[in-house]
Amino acid sequence: MIRFYLLIIVFLISLLSFLKAPEYHLWLLAVGVTEFPLIFFGISLLLTLTGFWAHKYQMAGTVLGVITMIIFLSPIVRAYWVSRTLRENMVNAFAGADGKEGPVLPASDTPFNFWNLFKIADTISYRTITYVKYTDTSMSLDFYPAQDQGAEFILPRPCVIVVHGGSWAGGDSRQLPELNSYLAFKGYNVAAINYRMAPKWQTPAPVEDIEAAISYLKNHSDELHIDIKNFVLLGRSAGAQIATLAAYTIHEPSIKGVIDFYGPEDMVWGYSIPSSRLIMDSRKVMEDYIGGTYSKVPQKYFACSPLEFVSRQSPPTLIIHGDNDVLVSPEHSRRLNLKLQQNGIKHYLLKLPWATHGFDYNLNGPGGQLSTFAVETFLKTVCAPTP
């Protein structure tokens, strides 16, 4: 009976592959279930095989175990389904962006590969640099130099500025660093920045920090081998709101594109439809960042809603969001997608049906592989590195 009860528990956990997590700790578990599926498949396999040859009363547990294993594998199956058309969709979406014909990808570049689930991401060393000093604080960035067969490039390369998440009040530049190393190995400089955070600092302080970071990187471009005409902003969650707001408002011609990982793009709508308090007190988070409730400072909510500043001059945009996100509703990305479409901006919304917030924690998981492919394809389009 213990085996049967354990299988029931594992079965209920497997449902996080399809259902939205109702509570914070279950959300964390959902990231593991969907992006490390083989681990949970292995657990259910062991439980299923235990007692498989025993008496007939074990059959119910065996059937439940088989069903559970199938559910745990579903993110992999769905990742293959999304990958079938991702390459073509990406190329078509960004063909002609910034005067380019679209990325030319070798046949070996596949959006999803089962065997990559077993890979461990390579890393490179970075150096920490102070990029701006204010009267009351200073901000730093972690710089990952573009690599050329294991050595730093000596020619100027594009630079990706990464803005971390953390509800505008937490996190730092060391968050999810695997993608930074991956992009550096692909020939892109990466600057993962720290920025001023709530509640001590409020919007638009982080956007000003991005401007300061771009200024610093331009001024030190010779030393860092940066192509000052090719910057791309990449943000996750709260960092995506900062990155897109900067891309759409500071009108910096060197910003060739912006990448939005599950960011809140409509702050007015987001405040009206808060997350479950069992997950996060999203209204309190927004009030700390913006400086008050919507009823008190409605103009500030409008002013920090990136989609309100989309225009025909906005840079190409890549949006990536999981349908099961319980921290930032995928409706934010759908709304931004519509606004970009209405303004004729080159863009693409990659929807991951099984994924939740933070799915890219595992770069080689189903969501991690697809999003990394999308990011690399986007970069090849909007700021192809100089050979």
Predicted segment positions?
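Hydrolase active-site cap/lid region
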Residues: 93-110, 244-299
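Alpha/beta-hydrolase active-site loop
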Residues: 202-222
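Short beta-strand/loop motif that positions the catalytic acidic residue
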Residues: 313, 319-321, 325
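Gly/Ser-rich "nucleophile elbow"/oxyanion-hole loop immediately N-terminal to the catalytic nucleophile
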Residues: 155, 218-233
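C-terminal catalytic histidine-bearing segment of alpha/beta-hydrolase fold enzymes
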Residues: 2, 10, 14-26, 320, ...
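Short amphipathic alpha-helix adjacent to the substrate-entry channel of hydrolases
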Residues: 174-191
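N-terminal cap/lid segment of alpha/beta-hydrolase-fold proteins
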Residues: 17-42, 101-153
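Short beta-strand element of the alpha/beta-hydrolase
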Residues: 154-166
